[in-house]
Amino acid sequence: MGAGSSTEQRSPEQPAGSDTPSELVLSGHGPAAEASGAAGDPADADPATKLPQKNGQLSTVNGVAEQGDVHVQEENQEGQEEEVVDEDVGQRESEDVREKDRVEEMAANSTAVEDITKDGQEETSEIIEQIPASESNVEEMVQPAESQANDVGFKKVFKFVGFKFTVKKDKNEKSDTVQLLTVKKDEGEGAEASVGAGDHQEPSVETAVGESASKESELKQSTEKQEGTLKQEQSSTEIPLQAESDQAAEEEAKDEGEEKQEKEPTKSPESPSSPVSSETTSSFKKFFTHGWAGWRKKTSFKKSKEDDLETAEKRKEQEAEKVDEEEKEKTEPASEEQEPAEDTDQARLSADYEKVELPLEDQVGDLEASSEEKCAPLATEVFDEKMEAHQEVVAEVHVSTVEKTEEEQGGGGEAEGGVVVEGTGESLPPEKLAEPQEVPQEAEPAEELMKSREMCVSGGDHTQLTDLSPEEKTLPKHPEGIVSEVEMLSSQERIKVQGSPLKKLFSSSGLKKLSGKKQKGKRGGGGDEEPGEYQHIHTESPESADEQKGESSASSPEEPEETTCLEKGPLEAPQDGEAEEGTTSDGEKKREGITPWASFKKMVTPKKRVRRPSESDKEEELEKVKSATLSSTDSTVSEMQDEVKTVGEEQKPEEPKRRVDTSVSWEALICVGSSKKRARKASSSDDEGGPRTLGGDSHRAEEASKDKEAGTDAVPASTQEQDQAQGSSSPEPAGSPSEGEGVSTWESFKRLVTPRKKSKSKLEEKAEDSSVEQLSTEIEPSREESWVSIKKFIPGRRKKRADGKQEQATVEDSGPVEINEDDPDVPAVVPLSEYDAVEREKMEAQGNAELPQLLGAVYVSEELSKTLVHTVSVAVIDGTRAVTSVEERSPSWISASVTEPLEHTAGEAMPPVEEVTEKDIIAEETPVLTQTLPEGKDAHDDMVTSEVDFTSEAVTATETSEALRTEEVTEASGAEETTDMVSAVSQLTDSPDTTEEATPVQEVEGGVLDTEEEERQTQAILQAVADKVKEESQVPATQTVQRTGSKALEKVEEVEEDSEVLASEKEKDVMPKGPVQEAGAEHLAQGSETGQATPESLEVPEVTADVDHVATCQVIKLQQLMEQAVAPESSETLTDSETNGSTPLADSDTADGTQQDETIDSQDSKATAAVRQSQVTEEEAATAQKEEPSTLPNNVPAQEEHGEEPGRDVLEPTQQELAAAAVPVLAKTEVGQEGEVDWLDGEKVKEEQEVFVHSGPNSQKAADVTYDSEVMGVAGCQEKESTEVQSLSLEEGEMETDVEKEKRETKPEQVSEEGEQETAAPEHEGTYGKPVLTLDMPSSERGKALGSLGGSPSLPDQDKAGCIEVQVQSLDTTVTQTAEAVEKVIETVVISETGESPECVGAHLLPAEKSSATGGHWTLQHAEDTVPLGPESQAESIPIIVTPAPESTLHPDLQGEISASQRERSEEEDKPDAGPDADGKESTAIEKVLKAEPEILELESKSNKIVLNVIQTAVDQFARTETAPETHAYDSQTQVPAMQADSQGAQQMLDKNESCQDETPSAAAQRGLASPDRSGGMGSASEMLAALAVESAGVKVSIEKLPPQPKDQKEHAADGPQLQSLAQAEASASGNLTKESPDTNGPKLTEEGDAPKVEVQEEEMSTKSVKENKAQAEEDLQEPKGDLAES
């Protein structure tokens, strides 16, 4: 026990300087321990032998602890204390070791008192000397390093070792102490035997310790196992450490002990004695925190005031006895040790007391410390409190293990099996002689109780262990006010006494005392505070008393704790401190006033009855009572408990009257209940301290009135419920009154429900309540917190009542609003049960109905919102009470209080259960939405992710509700509720308009987090929504998809876009209807196929390679994001053209974003509509954009200025790269280019799709390649042509030249690849034509999503989701699909980004195609590559890098071929396309497509071969990619493990970045890393690509610089297309994020690896954003590269 105490005290020292105390103790005990070891070698040898055995036993006992302990034990037994010490050191064992040393020293002193006297003198002097150091260390405990320096000493080490020995003994004794609970007699016997042999006689002590060690080992097995594995490990570790201490009594053990002790302070929390102390402390605190309420109440009923007095007296007597015994023990061990022991006992008692009491003070700290060995917080607390005593404590801790044991016996009596177990060791024998003797008598039953509790607590915490002792402590201590250190010193004695008093207390004296105190507190406290009001409360009914009692217990365990605190004393005083305000008088009153109690009963009963006649009077009185209860909460607790018992009987005759009044009382109760709830809510913030007590009383008063009104049955209901709530805290106090009455609980609830029907005046009462409650809210603030706990308990009561109430209230729901008033009480309950079931049913029905409802839902939701607003108004009319009650409920039931009023108001306003259920469901959904949306779209997305499972429209509705919310959030909370309801309705009835407003897709973001799940949801949603959207409107689906795609930013953007998007959607709707029928028919075929095939491919690819798909899709998303980084232009251009041309928004962004979203939600139908819209709209949008550019003057000049929009796009990137000044031009260029590009894209897409439809992917790719090369060439030409772009065109010319070269190199092969892939893809391309567009949309939508990504990087995840789903779609067809999608995306992107990086687009196509050809992995890598392609494609030589990476990843040969093909393509197509693009993009694109078709057909035949090779390679690479790309990414990226698969994309992005950075070396290295097999071809390809990468590094920088300008462009575009501005601003942010967003996508892909990449890319982005020299950008890229390497 001394060890436990000293352990805790040491742990205080050790916590401050966990290492230092060890060293100090080692230094202090080195000679002393050695002396004790030498003098008490028999004892030490035995303990060493026993301790190792015990270690084995304890480790076995600790079972779990055996893991770490076995090593320690074995090593310790082996004498390997160094390792073991290192392992075990750092935990509290240092003090435990000190305690062990003391115990051993004490044992050795008792065994060889003479030797120990000599050695003990040395030890004492050394210990004392070291204790000052330990004190300084204790002071330095905060500074363990200093403490370590001070602790350095074999003596200290040996002390710790000795303490370890002691701890072993103590631990054994602790186990005995734990046994003290049940086996404490045995311990007492063994300890007594030890004491009889000599307080510290080592032989007898060792024998007792040996016996107790076995017992303790066994007991600890049960107790410590219960205590927990950590404690087991701690005790086991401590035991091995102890064994080591025994074995390593040598200086090595000391040195190692120092290390150990250094570790031990950390580990000491694990030390068995300190675990016990921790248990004592933590369980003490936890028990106080958790168990005091219930246990106190139980004990309060058990214990009477007399018992408390008796217990206190007994404790005092036992304290005196223990003091005497301690003195004897002190005298026996050594006079030297006696003085330090006295100090140590005092200090340790202070420490123990502090341990015990501090747990109250620092329950949290102790709980926290319990992990570390709560002694540490205690040490800290004790250190704070004991800073004065620490020196003494330290010296005493070292000097007097016996007294520490004694004190711990006292403390152990307190902690009883906590501290007692700790202190039982050696000091336990003397004290056990007295204490166990006393304890066995009194504590046998109490021990069993304690043991069971301790057993429970040991599993939970040490709170109960300490808790029981604190009760004993508190019982004497509280009267003595032992909160101070001085009192703690006195409490040390008390603690000693309390060892047995705990048992006595558990023998029921303390329990009786506790109950007596509670009763007294109830009586006295109630009498002083407001007998009249309590009389009212009590007069109302025993129910109120029961309820008050139960409610007080339910309302706040604090109140029982308050009562118990009086009983338990200062231990609870910290907790009681809050309640003590009311409790102080209560304690006095409780002590004073049984008579006041009777008077209170009498007074309360009549007065309560008097006021009862009038509901308003009741309410007034209730509020008065509330105010009275505010002051008399504690008295109310005890009073209501006793009152429930006495007054319950007295009032039972009165119950008929009350029941007669029940209608009134129910009304008042309802009003009171609502007012309670409101007042509690209102007062929750106001009432926390004393007000809490008052609050408890007011709660009791209110609930008393409730229950009184409700009748005795209501009382049992509330009482039972409270009892159930209390049941955990104290079933006895609440349970006993409620046991007899509880039967009628539901009846009372039903009655409560029935009077509600009767009480139509409730509205008046509620109105009165509203005003009264407003007043009471002021009064009830204190009641609030009590209510908070009460609410926590009461919700169940409400549920129970609601169950009965639901039966009638459900019927009543159709009743007037009065019922709704009751509903505030009921609805929170009724909806909960009906809520979920009805919600599910309604969700299912709505899920079915949602499809048709989607369009009308918005209008319906508007009507519903009006109705709901009306309902809310009705609820308000009902009184603020409905809202108030909702607010009151919301904490207990639904976090969204506003939603609840809507629920209730809806239920009230719409009595029909169906309506109520629907509204509840809606409200329920809304709460989620309301809560989630406010919480964050991510959380909302998470919520919606599950909701998406419910219905895709649920997401849309959520989005809609989100938009509605955004609109209505400004409205009153009722309006918010209405909005939530409307949102729920919107969810239920999806509305495309709102959906567009709610476009934010972050729900999918949350879903995207679970990509597979998202894909599943998306597949379901895609199929359902695609069908729905196809059937209903492709636009809503597109909107929904877009919302899903970029909900957060798009929500803002689409708010801006909404008009445009609406216009664009209208245009889409109109345009798709027109041209879409043409090209749209093809897209319909493709889109439908894609929409259909997408789910199929989604399903298959998901299963096939969800990760790869996710990674690939994410990489594709990254690629597209990077492309958007490149094409904040394309996406911005798309966005601009989209924003500028709302139709282009549907076109390019819808084509792109819609396709992605289509992939996400309704990518199928949406992509079809989007593709139709894109193509038709792109043509029309190109026109419209050309027209819209006139609308957007900035864009008009760009478009009009640059008839060759691809060049502008190139210029646009260049502009973005070069200057914000170019940004306006960029916006212009984007719009114009986007319009034309979209036009070209539209026609080209049409043509491509026509070619695709006719020629297949090859013609598409021919068109794509041609168009890309056209765009590239034209872009280059136009770059050079446009003055704005000229400077940019210089870079872009270089970039273009490089990229074109790359594409010419790569593109011809990749054209063939693409052709082949498209050839392979035609199968999927018709199916995935849209996924390709989906990839397109991700580009533009990634502009949004990236813009959104700037706002919320998770949007790219949604984009990823789109891409993932696209990839899911294309994963099976990943090679083809990805190639196709990438090609199409690149086509669209190239079209839109044409100016940006046609080559880059080509590069994107090439890497994407390569990747897709290579496989899903290469999609990952090409996506990785493509991700860099975003910025790096923007760099346009990055495609080289990208190409090298994928090529290197794929095959150097393939890469070289692809590079050659791409270059050829880019050369062929760029050259042919350059002029036509400059001349007429559409005609040129068409002509080029036609021209390209032959070439593409040739390429197709070649591609077919290449694709077969590439697909085979992709398949091979797919496997390789898992290995090789992992190796590649792994090798290339230092970010190996997590990055391997996921970071393959991000790493390859980084690799590409690095390739740009490292250029040739990185590319070559990457290639070599990618695949050694490919390294050959990769060498050349990577060299070319590396050279291009060098250029692309600069280009990439400029291109990445472009996103910052897109920000400017976005700002300028914000003038016209604010959505684009947002998309671009965020796209530029995401441009910077582009690498981030690739990483955002990537990190989600490669959560670990990508994160560094994100940083790198962020740095790269920012570096590129610097818009400095390519060299600078490259250097910056290299810096992020270094960062990547670092990361």
Curated annotation (Swiss-Prot):
Renumbered ranges of motif AKAP CaM-binding 2: 743-763
Keyword Ligase tagged: no
Chain positions found as Phosphothreonine: 331, 629, 871
Protein name per its UniProtKB record: A-kinase anchor protein 12
GO cellular component annotations of the record: cytoplasm; cytoskeleton; cytosol; neuronal cell body; plasma membrane; Schaffer collateral - CA1 synapse
Post-translational modification, as annotated: Phosphorylated by PKC (in vitro).
Keywords linked to the UniProt accession: Calmodulin-binding, Cytoplasm, Cytoskeleton, Isopeptide bond, Lipoprotein, Membrane, Myristate, Phosphoprotein, Repeat, Ubl conjugation
Residues annotated with Phosphotyrosine modification: 353
Topology of the protein relative to the lipid bilayer: Lipid-anchor
Motif (AKAP CaM-binding 1): 594-614
Biased segments, Low complexity type: 30-48, 268-282, 417-426, 499-513, 727-744, 1618-1630
PROSITE patterns: AKAP_CAM_BD (PS51893)
